[in-house]
Design a protein with these regions (language model features):
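Terminus-proximal functional modules
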Residues: 1-68
């Protein structure tokens, strides 16, 4: 199955660690990162899409992406 996630977080080290952890679990970056200002919290937010192929599994809507 092919999986897709969109990782988001504040523009700080925690977001970088989230992306790094995903890369180390076999996820691959997909497309360009995003960067925007959250007017409610008044902080910059980052986003990055990631994809992963998992052999021998079928996708179901109940699939928990963080398990992969």
């Amino acid at each position: 199955m092919k999986l897709y996630r969109f990782l988001t977080g504040p523009d700080d080290a925690s977001f970088c660690h989230k992306v790094t952890a995903a890369l180390n679990k076999g996820w691959h970056l997909y497309g360009s990162p995003t960067y925007s200002y959250d007017t409610e919290t008044k902080i910059m937010k980052c986003g990055q899409a990631a994809v992963k192929d998992v052999e021998g599994k079928e996708y179901e809507p109940t699939t928990k992406l963080s398990d992969y």
